[in-house]
Amino acid sequence: MLSIILIASLILTIVTIVMFLASILSKKALIDREKSSPFECGFDPKSSSRLPFSLRFFLITIIFLIFDVEIALILPMIIIMKFSNIMIWTTTSIIFILILLIGLYHEWNQGMLNWSN
């Protein structure tokens, strides 16, 4: 048992050292302005590549991801219903859906779902 822990520790140490050395050796010495500028078919760019991004799009994306993960978690619950205690499954499902509804209400209350503002 001790030899397995020793070998695992040795492998972990070697991997850590290799990753550290790789990160040091792969860093660029200096940043070239031409290489970091946007490329538009050899022409100078018409505008800055760092345009401000609307926070509304970001928030809608986050809300979509949350509810997308919700669907990924709810679908297996339907299959698990056959194999588990119905009371535990019902309680878990109700708590899960209540947490999501409270989150949706909070987003609505904060005005995140109101696109007109």
UniProtKB/Swiss-Prot annotation:
Lineage: superkingdom: Eukaryota
Top-level class of the enzyme under EC nomenclature: translocase
Main location: mitochondrion
Short name of any one Pfam family annotated for the protein: Oxidored_q4
Record keywords, A-Z: Electron transport, Membrane, Mitochondrion, NAD, Respiratory chain, Translocase, Transmembrane, Transmembrane helix, Transport, Ubiquinone
Transmembrane regions: 4-24, 60-80, 86-106
Its membrane topology: Multi-pass membrane protein
Cellular compartments annotated: Mitochondrion membrane
Enzyme Commission code(s) on record: 7.1.1.2
MF-aspect GO terms: NADH dehydrogenase (ubiquinone) activity
Catalysis: reaction(s): a ubiquinone + NADH + 5 H(+)(in) = a ubiquinol + NAD(+) + 4 H(+)(out)
GO cellular component, one term: NADH dehydrogenase complex
Presence of the UniProt keyword Transmembrane helix in the record: yes
Alphabetized PANTHER family for the sequence: NADH-UBIQUINONE OXIDOREDUCTASE CHAIN 3
Functional description taken from the UniProt entry: Core subunit of the mitochondrial membrane respiratory chain NADH dehydrogenase (Complex I) that is believed to belong to the minimal assembly required for catalysis. Complex I functions in the transfer of electrons from NADH to the respiratory chain. The immediate electron acceptor for the enzyme is believed to be ubiquinone.
Family of this protein: Belongs to the complex I subunit 3 family.
Protein name (database record): NADH-ubiquinone oxidoreductase chain 3
Gene this chain is encoded by: mt:ND3
